[in-house]
């Protein structure tokens, strides 16, 4: 019985430590939102967000970020 308890506690400790190494680091650049005051131009210049969604342009991404707690970054220019 003692061996089983020690084994389970060891496995639990190992899993809790290993959980930190599996977190994915999201990389990208922050959208330039200084021009996004009144509205966005209707120019299709797509950007791919770190959330996997294609936004029509960087300005649209800025307006979406205003609704969020955690901002979406630009993963790359062009569609996802």
UniProtKB/Swiss-Prot annotation:
Instruction: Report the record's disulfide bonds.
Output: 33-62, 40-59, 48-80
What is known about the tissue distribution of this protein? Answer: In the genital tract, expressed only in male accessory glands including seminal vesicle, coagulating gland and prostate.
Site, Necessary for sperm binding: residue positions:
44-45
Q: Where is the Kazal-like domain?
A: 27-80
* GO BP terms: negative regulation of calcium ion import; negative regulation of nitric oxide mediated signal transduction; nitric oxide mediated signal transduction; regulation of acrosome reaction; regulation of store-operated calcium entry; sperm capacitation
Q: Does the keyword Secreted apply?
A: yes
**Residues in the signal sequence:** 1-23
Where found, per UniProt? Answer: Secreted
What GO cellular component entries does it have?
extracellular space
In Pfam terms, one family for this protein is Kazal_1
InterPro entries xref list: Kazal_dom (IPR002350), Kazal_dom_sf (IPR036058), Prot_inh_Kazal-m (IPR001239)
Q: Which Gene3D superfamilies match?
A: 3.30.60.30
Question: Which GO molecular function entries does the Swiss-Prot or TrEMBL record give?
Answer: peptidase inhibitor activity; serine-type endopeptidase inhibitor activity
Q: What is the effect of changing residue 67 to S?
A: No effect on trypsin inhibitor activity or sperm binding
Deletion phenotype, per the entry, is: Lethal with no survival past two weeks of age. Animals are small and show severe, progressive degeneration of pancreatic tissue associated with autophagic cell death.
Q: What induces this one?
A: By androgens in adult male sex accessory glands. Expressed constitutively in pancreas.
Which residue positions does UniProt flag as site: Reactive bond for trypsin? 42-43
Q: PANTHER family recorded for this chain?
A: SERINE PROTEASE INHIBITOR, SERINE PROTEASE INHIBITOR KAZAL-TYPE 1
Protein name according to UniProt = Serine protease inhibitor Kazal-type 1
Instruction: Give the organism's phylogenetic lineage.
Output: Eukaryota, Metazoa, Chordata, Craniata, Vertebrata
């Amino acid at each position: 019985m003692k061996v089983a308890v020690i084994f389970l506690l060891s496995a639990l400790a190992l899993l809790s430590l290993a959980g930190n190494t599996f977190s994915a680091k999201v990389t990208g650049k922050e959208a330039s939102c200084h021009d996004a005051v009144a509205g966005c131009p209707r120019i299709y210049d797509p950007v791919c967000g770190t959330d996997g969604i294609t936004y029509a342009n960087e300005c649209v991404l800025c307006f979406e970020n205003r609704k969020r707690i955690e901002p979406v970054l630009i993963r790359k220019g062009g569609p996802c």
